[in-house]
């Protein structure tokens, strides 16, 4: 058996540069993994691919990206074996934290190791890109700028390690719906975009930006209230991650983050997590 942790991510900066003719959008986004994890277990089996998601009403077939990831890498490798996968969720669903993409990436990584398939990291990233635009990022070491539809990665050097308080308000948001409502016309020309610096806590606070907030916060005004609350309890800045609805605040040390987590977690209506940057 092989056990592996599957981390969440936050978007420290997200600009939607243009809508493409294929209806996808070109992005520039800075992604950072954080220490909130789902747990995955893999057990070799002779009964094909079996997926279990105890405690959650999640599909346990090809509708689940974990199942598809397992099927794809075993098919690519020609390996005739099967595997039983157990997924224990801690990352909120449809929350802008990349839980599904992370689960798929860790499935590729785990099965490559478990069955000694000998795919390189680059090859795993190519397989991952066929499953979802964010999947390659979770196979990439450290924070990264992602371009295109999010699948072209460049290492983000010298991004400071910080603490985060994540607040998930308990409802789900459809990424597809948010992009459909984004007021961005079809743009054919290439957009030239200047990347902000993220070399210090001050840089990070100044660089926090998410174009998708213009849609999600209009649909759910309570998210702005959460951002304001985080700042009032010591966050240097606050932002919605991805298409939402999770909002995070950045803190310079663990003590300040823990204090905010304690206070903001008391009402019990939100899921509140104190986490740190990881590579």
UniProtKB/Swiss-Prot annotation:
Entry-linked InterPro entries: GHMP_kinase_C_dom (IPR013750), GHMP_kinase_C_sf (IPR036554), GHMP_kinase_N_dom (IPR006204), IspE (IPR004424), Ribosomal_Su5_D2-typ_SF (IPR020568), Ribsml_uS5_D2-typ_fold_subgr (IPR014721)
**Could you say which residues form the signal peptide?**
none
Q: Which species is this record about?
A: Syntrophus aciditrophicus (strain SB)
Keywords on record: ATP-binding, Isoprene biosynthesis, Kinase, Nucleotide-binding, Transferase
Family of this protein = Belongs to the GHMP kinase family. IspE subfamily.
| Entry EC number(s) | 2.7.1.148
Say yes or no: keyword Kinase present.
Answer: yes
A GO molecular function annotation here is:
4-(cytidine 5'-diphospho)-2-C-methyl-D-erythritol kinase activity
One GO BP annotation is: isopentenyl diphosphate biosynthetic process, methylerythritol 4-phosphate pathway
Job description of the protein: Catalyzes the phosphorylation of the position 2 hydroxy group of 4-diphosphocytidyl-2C-methyl-D-erythritol.
Residues engaged in binding ATP: 92-102
Catalysed reaction per UniProt?
A: 4-CDP-2-C-methyl-D-erythritol + ATP = 4-CDP-2-C-methyl-D-erythritol 2-phosphate + ADP + H(+)
Instruction: Please verify whether the record's keywords include Kinase.
Output: yes
Q: Which residues form the active site?
A: 9, 134
- Return the broad EC class: transferase
PANTHER family in the record: 4-DIPHOSPHOCYTIDYL-2-C-METHYL-D-ERYTHRITOL KINASE, CHLOROPLASTIC
Pathway the protein contributes to: Isoprenoid biosynthesis; isopentenyl diphosphate biosynthesis via DXP pathway; isopentenyl diphosphate from 1-deoxy-D-xylulose 5-phosphate: step 3/6
The protein's name in its UniProt record: 4-diphosphocytidyl-2-C-methyl-D-erythritol kinase
């Amino acid at each position: 058996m092989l056990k592996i942790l599957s981390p969440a991510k936050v978007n420290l900066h997200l600009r939607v540069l243009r809508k493409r003719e294929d209806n996808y959008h070109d992005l520039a986004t800075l992604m950072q993994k954080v220490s909130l994890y789902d747990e995955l277990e893999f057990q070799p089996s002779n009964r094909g691919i079996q997926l279990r998601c105890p405690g959650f009403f999640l599909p346990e077939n090809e509708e689940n990206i974990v199942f598809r990831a397992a099927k794809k890498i075993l098919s690519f490798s020609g390996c005739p074996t099967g595997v039983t996968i157990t997924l224990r969720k801690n990352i909120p669903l449809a929350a802008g934290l990349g839980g599904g993409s992370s689960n798929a990436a860790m499935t590729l990584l785990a099965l490559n190791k478990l069955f000694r398939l000998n795919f390189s990291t680059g090859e795993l990233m190519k397989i991952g890109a066929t499953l979802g635009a964010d999947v390659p990022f979770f196979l990439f070491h450290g924070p990264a700028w992602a371009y295109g539809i999010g699948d072209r990665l460049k290492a983000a050097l010298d991004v400071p390690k910080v603490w985060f308080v994540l607040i998930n308000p308990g409802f789900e948001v459809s990424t597809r719906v948010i992009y459909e409502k984004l007021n961005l016309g079809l743009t054919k020309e290439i957009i030239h975009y200047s990347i902000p610096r993220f070399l210090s806590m001050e840089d990070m606070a100044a660089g926090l930006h998410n174009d998708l907030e213009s849609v999600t916060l209009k649909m759910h005004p309570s998210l702005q209230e959460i951002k304001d609350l985080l700042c009032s309890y010591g966050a240097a800045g606050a932002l919605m991650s991805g298409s939402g609805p999770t909002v995070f605040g950045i803190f310079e040390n663990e003590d300040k983050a823990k204090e905010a987590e304690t206070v903001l977690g008391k009402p019990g209506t939100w899921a509140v997590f104190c986490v740190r940057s990881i590579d």
